[in-house]
UniProtKB/Swiss-Prot annotation:
GO terms for molecular function: asparaginyl-tRNA synthase (glutamine-hydrolyzing) activity; ATP binding; glutaminyl-tRNA synthase (glutamine-hydrolyzing) activity. Keywords: ATP-binding, Ligase, Nucleotide-binding, Protein biosynthesis. Allows the formation of correctly charged Asn-tRNA(Asn) or Gln-tRNA(Gln) through the transamidation of misacylated Asp-tRNA(Asn) or Glu-tRNA(Gln) in organisms which lack either or both of asparaginyl-tRNA or glutaminyl-tRNA synthetases. The reaction takes place in the presence of glutamine and ATP through an activated phospho-Asp-tRNA(Asn) or phospho-Glu-tRNA(Gln). The lineage of its organism: Bacteria, Bacillati, Bacillota, Clostridia, Lachnospirales. This is Aspartyl/glutamyl-tRNA(Asn/Gln) amidotransferase subunit B.
């Protein structure tokens, strides 16, 4: 078999975090009864006229600045003409000729430490389509226009990626950057971030591109990785068998791990683009652009360096924390309250991530940091109570599980469940003396040189005091009394 190379470019659609749609005042809230967030504009009624949501321009330009794009200061909208039941106007308002952002790039770091630059061809603004719901039992399809007119940006990369790993690194960098901006929550499972994979293969060393396919319906990074590997293998098998790869759009079925052809892949001329006559061109002034640049937040790489320098965190901790804007918010707010950065980091990377994994296992889908609802104040309170020896570590973990699940009040939970640590030496001494008297064999083992036997005695003391004893004091008393 010849040596083949995969060539990948991505079209990433990101739903912007505006409260209303791109050209009307309807809500963009996810969920809701079908067709409850609609009006004549977003359902394409004759005579209705679009009015541009300024926040969409702000978010699109901000993402462009964050990805090193050139901002088109005079841009406009075009109509992309096609018929489909979820498209009530029979055209989509998009940008072809003068997109808002061009010629950007993001730098990614691969698992072996290699740095790679992925170029961005353009970022353009557009409106989303509605959603078709197929009822196989009744044999009918329904359409929900709640999503119709929701603002999107489409980030079109150059075909610079050569592996699934590079694709995931690029998408992770994009998602983190956009979340830091607050431009979108980028939840793949809810469709607020969607990636279409354009993929072809060619002999390694060739400068000619192969015939590309576009793969859709990719709802997680894991699905994207599986789809890339499957499509690469499919195209290589076709070429090796002397058959042609057809330029087409394919739909990925992640349960069965295969794709099937949906339709032939269209080119721009198939959509008969022309300037939208109902929308005036957009002018982005130098002053407005300077204002947007000044509002750019501290992004992952800068924040990571600061965490290492300012808080003395190990590089690994700083890398994990800054992967998610939500983690950084919890870390910074909790640290500001309790002034224990390493302990806050340990709780996020330990107990928080453990509970997130358990939640993922229960639901069968990845539980993301953005779904966390507990307050940083609660975490800081737990850490402070442990530091003051008012509760022990076991109680702290119990409390945090309830904070994670229900955001309970920490003080109230401690009081209600009697979790305050016993630090009274007299009470502890009496219990320790009884445990020593009740466990002569463990005492003999300890005195005979089996130092680990003291662990059993500590455990028995903790059990006798219902887990409320100060374990450090218990250990010290045992060593004193067993001399």
């Amino acid at each position: 078999m010849k040596d083949y190379e995969v060539v990948i470019g991505l079209e990433v659609h990101v739903e912007l975090a505006t409260k209303t749609k791109i050209f009307c005042g309807c809500s963009t809230e996810f969920g809701g009864a079908p067709n409850s967030h609609t009006c004549p504009v977003c359902t394409g009624m004759p005579g209705s006229l679009p009015v541009l949501n300024k926040k969409v321009v702000e978010y699109a330009a901000a993402v462009g600045l964050a990805t090193n794009c050139t901002i088109t200061q005079d841009c406009k909208f075009d109509r992309k003409n096609y018929f489909y039941p979820d498209n009530p106007q029979n055209y989509q308002i998009s940008q072809l000729y003068l997109p808002i952002c061009r010629n950007g790039h993001v730098d990614v770091t691969l698992s072996d430490g290699t740095e790679k630059t992925i170029r961005i061809h353009e970022i353009h603004m557009e409106e989303d389509a509605g959603k078709l719901v197929h009822d196989e039992w009744e044999g009918v399809s329904y359409v929900d226009y709640n999503r119709s007119g929701v603002p999107l940006i489409e980030i079109v990369s150059e075909p610079d990626m050569r592996s699934a790993e590079e694709v995931i690194a690029y998408l992770t960098k994009l998602r983190t950057t956009i979340q830091y901006l607050g431009a979108s929550d980028c939840k793949l499972q809810e469709g607020s971030m969607r990636a279409d994979v354009n993929l072809s293969v060619r002999e390694r060393g060739s400068n000619e591109f192969g015939t590309r396919t576009e793969t859709k319906n990719l709802n997680s990074f894991a699905a994207i990785e599986r789809a890339i590997k499957a499509e690469t293998a499919r195209q290589i098998d076709l070429i090796e068998a002397g058959e042609k790869v057809v330029q087409e759009t394919r739909r990925w079925n992640d349960d069965k791990e295969y794709s099937y052809a949906m339709r032939s892949k269209e080119d721009a001329q198939d959509y008969r683009y022309f300037p939208d006559p109902d929308l005036v061109p957009i002018h982005i002034s130098d002053e407005y652009l300077a204002e947007l640049k000044a509002k750019q937040p501290e992004f992952k790489d800068e924040k990571k360096a600061r965490y290492i320098e300012e808080f003395g965190l190990p590089e690994y901790d700083a890398e994990i924390l800054t992967d998610s804007k939500k983690f950084t918010e919890i870390f910074e707010e909790a640290t500001a309250i309790c002034n224990q950065p390493k302990k806050v980091s340990n709780w996020i990377m330990g107990e928080t991530m453990r509970l997130m994994k358990e939640e993922s296992a229960k639901t069968g889908r990845e539980f993301r940091a953005e779904e966390l609802t507990f307050s940083p104040e609660s975490l800081a309170k737990i850490i402070t109570l442990v530091e003051k020896k008012e509760i022990n570590n076991a109680a702290a973990k119990e409390i945090f599980e309830h904070v994670f699940a229900e955001n309970v009040d920490v003080d109230a939970y401690v009081e209600e469940h009697g979790l305050k640590q016993v630090n009274d030496e007299g009470a502890l001494r009496a219990t320790v003396e009884k445990v020593i008297a009740d466990n002569p064999q463990s005492v003999a083992d300890y005195k005979g040189g089996k130092k680990q036997a003291i662990g059993y005695l500590v455990g028995q003391t903790m059990k006798a005091m219902q887990g409320k004893a100060n374990p450090g004091m218990v250990n010290a008393l045992l060593q004193e009394l067993l001399k």
